[in-house]
């Protein structure tokens, strides 16, 4: 067994005055036991060198063994190959820690009892306090190692670890190792260390320079590659542009050559024409200057065929021969005469003058036509009020105070078919289109034209067409439009009421009461001496025509009332003891009329042709809800003995005349005079009425509105019993 290393520590050595190391500090005062008991810190270095076998002289280092060193390549891992001869392995050459150096990993053979030989661990620089790292498990080791005073770094721990690995069962067993160091091995180790340091520096520099060169070469190659590519692209562009320019020049030259050829051909053609014209001119001059004998005229050559130009002149030409160019072109040297420019200004002026003349003519025609149109309008407007378009008559605006039967004839012809039929018994109403009227009052014109009403009466329609109408009622001196469907509904109701009384219709027909058109009064035919008074009624203004006939002749009204009173056939206007004004033959005036228009969706009235029959003293029991409401049953108009067709009836045949169908539709009250409602069946209430409006349906196709004037309150009136 070897001696244990645990023993008393020797006292710290005295500081060496020749030593270069600084004086030990408090930490350095702690003594560290050496790995080998044969060496101590107090032993001088000279003795150690002598023990190692080195001479006392200078120590020399040689680098003869540099070739035997192994340097790994860049791609190889830093592994030291194992030498089979001495069973040693060189460690990694990479620095690991502060005490980096060439550290050898001790390989422990399988045979644990044998002596373990390890390579020496030599550090570059190791402080003195690094021996603390080897303390601990190294107290049980006896490793005689040279240069133990320099510290062993981590070698002690490595060896101990290897030893412990080889013998894990006995950790506290001290391992005796005898390291045999030879002089040659020591020298080789030191030389190898220095060579390795130098080689590492050289290798680093070479690597850096190599990397530098490789980077520079790569950059230079990249730059040169880009420049070459640019040069190639530039060359390609230049070649393409040069080729395109050559092609353009070639095409341009070809076009110019083609133009030159065309010009030469044109010049040749023109030269031929000029020579032909000049020859013809010379021939004509010769003929004029000679005896007047004209040679036979040669026909002109066809188009495109001109006589060739001869180099020698014509015998009759006074001018010298042509000078031909040497190039072969037949262009003469004589100047070609230019054509005189046309007078464009004169033509433009002529065109302008023509356009101005045409415009003036157009304006004249337009003005004349416009004047003619104005004249026609003026003529038509002046004659329109005179001519009665509806009935083909002429109004008496230009007749003045002529005492002629023609006015009477015009009245009869103008107001025919406008007779309101009233029965004396009040049974019904109707309109007869009687054309048997007096054509004159002269004794010379004794023949009278009698036409039965049945021949000229208008037959009612079959009721297949829808009828739509509108009613205009005067209100506040204005005409207010009222829907005609209300009137048509009233007509239907009235026709139903009349149809129920058809069996008791009266067969007697009395004279008709004529109502003049265009607001003219329906007066009896006056004597010849009263034509002026009739003309006064005919030529009144429109406002006067819409008023009552009270402004007319008072004597006429009195005579008519007396006649009606004498006849005793007037009917009552209101019932229950209230005396009302009665109608007379001169109290109704036509206000307006309108035809029923046929449109889809309207009410279709019945097509029955019946006459209304209404008994005497008929009372309307319905109350008036509005001043314009339609009455339930038609109100008959009283008959009259004085009739325009009375004389005609005496001279006519005895057969019965059937008038056309007519019906009183409604009776309206003037809103300015009527009250708001009925008072005991009275239309106007306690306020007296001056006029009423009566709407009559003629032949189920035309509505006529009459304005009937009631006598004044002071006028005489009768009440039938």
From Swiss-Prot:
Keyword Transport in annotation: no
Intracellular or extracellular location(s): Endoplasmic reticulum membrane; Golgi apparatus membrane; Nucleus
Keywords recorded for this protein, A-Z: Activator, DNA-binding, Endoplasmic reticulum, Glycoprotein, Golgi apparatus, Membrane, Nucleus, Stress response, Transcription, Transcription regulation, Transmembrane, Transmembrane helix
InterPro entries: bZIP, bZIP_sf
Span list, region Leucine-zipper: 267-274
Biased composition (Pro residues): 9-25
Primary localization class, coarse: endoplasmic reticulum
Sequence motif: RRIL cleavage motif, positions: 627-630
Superkingdom: Eukaryota
Pfam families xrefs: bZIP_1
Annotated membrane topology: Single-pass membrane protein
Residues carrying covalently attached carbohydrate according to the record: 450, 462, 609, 617, 643, 651
Domain bZIP: 228-288
Segments in the Cytoplasmic topological domain: 1-366
Lumenal side of membrane: 388-721
GO terms for cellular component: endoplasmic reticulum; endoplasmic reticulum membrane; Golgi membrane; nucleus
Region feature Disordered, mapped onto this chain: 1-51, 87-232, 337-359, 422-462
Gene Ontology MF terms in the entry: DNA-binding transcription factor activity; sequence-specific DNA binding; transcription cis-regulatory region binding
Outcome of gene disruption: No visible phenotype under normal growth conditions, but mutant plants have increased sensitivity to salt-induced osmotic stress.
Family, similarity comment: Belongs to the bZIP family.
Stated role: Transcriptional activator involved in salt and osmotic stress responses. Functions as a stress sensor and transducer in a signaling pathway that resembles an ER stress response. Following salt stress, BZIP17 is cleaved by SBT6.1 (S1P) and S2P at the C-terminus and the N-terminal bZIP component is translocated to the nucleus, where it activates the expression of salt stress response genes. Functions as a stress sensor and transducer in ER stress signaling pathway.
Quaternary assembly: Interacts with BZIP28.
Protein name: bZIP transcription factor 17
